Amino acid sequence: MSDTSHLLKHLVGYVESRERIAEREKTGSDFSEDKGKNSAQIAKLHPKRLQLEVAEVTQETPSTKTFRLKSAHGELPPFQAGQYINLFVTIDGVETARPYAISSCPSHRDYYDLTVKIVEGGFVTNYLLNKVEPGQQFSATSPMGTFYYNPIIHGKKLVFLAGGSGGAPARAMIESVLNRGVDAEFYLVYGNSFENDVIFQDTFQALAAKHDNFHLTEVISRPSEGFDGLRGHLNAERITEAVGSVEDAMFYVCGPTPFNEYCKEQLVSLGVKDKRIRIECNGPPKQPSALEHWPAGADEQAMVTVKVRGKGEFKAQVGEPLLNSLERNGYFVENACRSGECSLCRVKVMEGEVFNAPESKLRKSDATFGWVHSCVAFPTTDIEILF
């Protein structure tokens, strides 16, 4: 076996750790006095639950508010720009949760900003916009998610394609890397419906004026008469006009699910490889029946019976994610991303059939043993589940 001791000496903190161990051994210590310290530190950095209080509410645009959340008890854990927290709420007796990207920079350690845009029929989003005021408290997960910039492997040409609410994670990521002086070229191609409803427009324009390596392109799809800016959608032609060559660029796509899907199609048509496209998780598909492999004859509006082994049963709509149906009927399942990524909402299908959306990050063994991610699973027949 090769001698690796000379390599270990170059690891940061290795020599100091060995010296501390040697000192402890001289006193006959068995290190029991340190038991639990690592667990305590991990719990501090990654607590299972946070208790947050709304400190401020800011009206950003006619359709959007920013909620500044501070810890109700102690410090907030650090996060990577682009990550989200899952906010738990109780609305009309229904316990549920939704993930929201943190729109503030990680350098602001005493608060998280959540920027929320109105959604047609949005159960939680519209509750936040219409009902929540300073002083209210919420439970939330710690920051999580994989949608963030990696300086080691993402290269030096970073392109953000943002639509509407996608301005929230884009703002945190772009402001963070620019403030750190990262040696790279940054592009933001930002699509919105109306010119008077652009989230963080002043912030992005100020950053573009201040930093020569940040290039901003704004596009409006439903402009008013007389609007003299760029019109249309973020199609392949618009993307290449804004960023030039797509070769070696890393793309970050953030916005509503239809926007993300459309942008990916455009990037693929330009020859961008999957590994150069990072997409923010943003909820289950709105119309699962339009997806490939949806069962022939399955009607989104149909009702099926969901039996929860040992707990009861209820009626659920085929076109509604199983997790949503469970929550509406009083069953709590741990969850975070609600996009098929984190796997916290796994349930086991004992009988019946479900449709798993492409977002579901299932393993081969999951299919073998019947596990599904309930946030992106749709019951297409009567089913029995276990969790």
Segments predicted by a language model, with ranges:
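FNR/FR-type flavoprotein reductase catalytic core
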Residues: 1-13, 121-307
